[in-house]
Amino acid sequence: MTTILQINSAARSQGAQSTLLANELTAKLQQSNAGAKVVVRDLLADGLPHLDESVLGAFFTPADQRSAEQNAIVAKSDALIAELQAADIIVIGAPMYNFGVSSQLKTYFDWIARAGVTFRYTENGPEGLIKGKKVYVVTARGGKYLGTPNDSHTPYLRTFLGFIGLTDVSFIHAEGLNLGPDSQSAALASAREAIAAA
């Protein structure tokens, strides 16, 4: 059975365009993969703690020396990574905030980026360990940045995902959402056209 993991990272629980479009894409992919199981990871609802001394300490303490608190932190990270590993298709709703990803998504990345677990260092450089998955990233942006030096959003996402082994990545952009009704309509129509073709 195909498993689709949808990761919502908007800072709004209702009405976020990245989430709405990610929902549409997941529904389309579910139709294309009969019997597919859908798992939704809502990062806003999860409220993962930002990377701090306690989280880093847990990740870098040998398993046989961890405290109960550290074991709980690592167990949460392990569960997030297992969820990612179990997915065949990953859909990420990733709005652009101030030229980057949401703090929720950055925190999620910090919780799943673990040396020896999701990547490793070799004599030839780093190697991602989460492989063989298709990733769709649905972005929502108030302005238009694609193809300009101000688009630090797309390369960051591609770089991080590639670092942990996720190299088959397709982007669906909805840009210009805050540039007036006509621009918003055109942006959503373009995104939905890409969703239909996915």
Curated annotation (Swiss-Prot):
Database matches in InterPro entries: Flavodoxin_fold (IPR003680), Flavoprotein-like_sf (IPR029039), FMN-dep_NADH:Q_OxRdtase_AzoR1 (IPR050104), NADH:quinone_OxRdtase_FMN_depd (IPR023048)
Cofactor dependence: FMN
Keywords: Flavoprotein, FMN, NAD, Oxidoreductase
MF GO annotations: electron transfer activity; FMN binding; oxidoreductase activity, acting on NAD(P)H as acceptor; oxidoreductase activity, acting on NAD(P)H, quinone or similar compound as acceptor
Segments passing through the bilayer: none
Cofactor note: Binds 1 FMN per subunit.
Subunit structure and binding partners: Homodimer.
Functional description taken from the UniProt entry: Quinone reductase that provides resistance to thiol-specific stress caused by electrophilic quinones. Also exhibits azoreductase activity. Catalyzes the reductive cleavage of the azo bond in aromatic azo compounds to the corresponding amines.
Family the entry assigns: Belongs to the azoreductase type 1 family.
Name of protein: FMN-dependent NADH:quinone oxidoreductase
Annotated source species: Burkholderia ambifaria (strain MC40-6)
Lineage: Bacteria, Pseudomonadati, Pseudomonadota, Betaproteobacteria, Burkholderiales
Gene encoding the protein: azoR
